[in-house]
């Protein structure tokens, strides 16, 4: 490989690294909402998996504690799946054409 080609590859790698960092930073601003119990429990989180808000309908507060805990867990898991899917979608544009192993999640 010639020096010019190597320098070009290094510039491309550096540019891709900068683009990945920008995309990862942008994911912190994208919010998704998971819900359970027909929307009685909602979890809002960023695509960086930071929980921002949990909303519980007041009608559930007098109900069974175990059921409420299950609904919170289900809403959290729903939000997490949505955050992961959104992250993968946003990051896939940056990795198009790269030979990544199947199932590899980004950002790393």
Curated annotation (Swiss-Prot):
Q: Which UniProt keywords apply?
A: Cytoplasm, DNA-binding
InterPro entries xrefs: YbaB-like_sf, YbaB/EbfC
UniProt subcellular location: Cytoplasm, Nucleoid
Q: Which Gene3D superfamilies match?
A: Nucleoid-associated protein YbaB-like domain
What's the short name of a Pfam family annotated to this entry? YbaB_DNA_bd
Mind telling me which SUPFAM superfamilies this protein's record contains?
Answer: YbaB-like (SSF82607)
Give the GO molecular function terms: DNA binding
Q: Please give an example of a GO cellular component term from this record.
A: bacterial nucleoid
Coiled coil stretches, renumbered: none
Note the subunit structure.
Homodimer.
The record's section on HAMAP family has: DNA_YbaB_EbfC
**What role does it play?**
Binds to DNA and alters its conformation. May be involved in regulation of gene expression, nucleoid organization and DNA protection.
Similarity annotation? Belongs to the YbaB/EbfC family.
**What is this protein's name?**
Nucleoid-associated protein BAV0915
Highest classification ranks of the organism:
Bacteria, Pseudomonadati, Pseudomonadota, Betaproteobacteria, Burkholderiales
